[in-house]
Amino acid sequence: MGNNIKVTFNPDKIAAWWPAVGTYYTTTYPQNQSVFQPGIYQTTSLINPKNQQELDSVLINRYKQIDWNTWQGFPVDQKLPLVSRDPPLKPHINQSAQTFEIKPGPIIVPGIRDIPRGLVPPQTPTNRDQGRKPTPPTPPLRDTHPHLTMKNQTFRLQGFVDGLRDLTTTERYHNAYGDPFTTLSPVVPTVSTILSPPSTTGDPALSPEMSPSSLLGLLAGLQVVYFLWTKILTIAQNLDWWWTSLSFPGGIPECTGQNSQFQTCKHLPTSCPPTCNGFRWMYLRRFIIYLLVLLLCLIFLLVLLDWKGLIPVCPLQPTTETTVNCRQCTLSVQDTYTPPYCCCLKPTAGNCTCWPIPSSWALGNYLWEWALARFSWLNLLVPLLQWLGGISLIAWFLLIWMIWFWGPALLSILPPFIPIFVLFFLIWVYI
């Protein structure tokens, strides 16, 4: 009989009432509308069941043979009946028996209970059996706290859902009476197994771009910038004091603010208020000082880039030369030198004279060669520069510190010895 239930009964007797597969009325005219409820079933055939208990015992025995956690013993091709609100066809009066066949339908998940899946316990007789007006069906209660019972049912739900995943199909099924024009969608009640964390109010939400570490780094950077800015202002003020002192060898006098529209109190020329006539000159000196400091920073940056070899400048007098085709001038020549290469500006017969750019101090060599070409006396400083270049970095820092600390005191002592130092230098160079 395939995957369907066939229950044969005498139309003069109430044969069976089973919510899992449907409600059957065997009278000539049913007083109550039949309601076919969903359920999981196996092929079952009963001829004229005597009472409800007989049908219950047969179906319960069938359902007990199935392990609903692993779905062992349940045929893979078993389907569920569709929900139909239509009553059975009205039987003929002279008909001795009638067979209802429920065809397969989409899977509908049964309720989560502590009984085998698909088996719904028989209901007690209601007022419908006594001829009263049927009461409307009560909608199922909504589970407002699914997380309270989720822990005990997670394992059982997992096996049940795995079985449903194997049985679910997307084909179009007929309804309980074989009507091909009605297709009912399955209703699958699910319980979420993922609990969302409790949301807190009042806490500021930090974006991924503004993490605590980046916020601390920003604050530290602002402090460093503020510290450097105060130091720059201090350096500018000290340089302004030194520049002003050049005009007053005997000492910087106080600015009384006379000859101005607004009388001001006495102050120094390096801190004139906006109402003083010396205010514009003070800021002009500060502006020139800032430009000089910026120029020093640029010179330091150029020296650093030239030392790293990031300023490719061709030397004026190359030490090594290579003559190759002009098309290959920027390529390596027998892997002797590393690119890039420099070419002459006037090629002869399609050939270029190429020489490599120094890997370090290219700009310095170019400027030095340019100065030697115009000032020949600079060759006398070559030994001194070579000697200074051989001094270690620690010796340089020590020399700078000694000049900074003892320089002002030595200015009054060294002038008598300067001619002797010049004589010793000339002897050391030419002898």
From Swiss-Prot:
Q: Mind listing the UniProt keywords for this protein, alphabetically?
A: Acetylation, Caveolin-mediated endocytosis of virus by host, Fusion of virus membrane with host endosomal membrane, Fusion of virus membrane with host membrane, Glycoprotein, Host-virus interaction, Lipoprotein, Membrane, Myristate, Transmembrane, Transmembrane helix, Viral attachment to host cell, Viral envelope protein, Viral penetration into host cytoplasm, Virion, Virus endocytosis by host, Virus entry into host cell
Record localization: Virion membrane
Q: Which residues are glycosylated?
A: 351
Q: Does the keyword Metal-binding apply?
A: no
Q: List residues in topological domain: Intravirion.
A: 2-286, 236-286, 401-406
Pfam families to which the protein is assigned, alphabetical: vMSA
Query: Could you tell me the Gene Ontology terms of the biological process aspect for this record?
Result: caveolin-mediated endocytosis of virus by host cell; fusion of virus membrane with host endosome membrane; virion attachment to host cell
Stretches the record annotates as Disordered = 115-146
Ranges in the topological domain labelled Virion surface: 2-214, 308-379, 430-431
Q: Which InterPro entries does the record cross-reference, listed alphabetically?
A: HBV_HBSAG
Q: Which family does it belong to?
A: Belongs to the orthohepadnavirus major surface antigen family.
Can you name this protein?
Large envelope protein
State the species of origin: Woodchuck hepatitis B virus (isolate 59) (WHV)
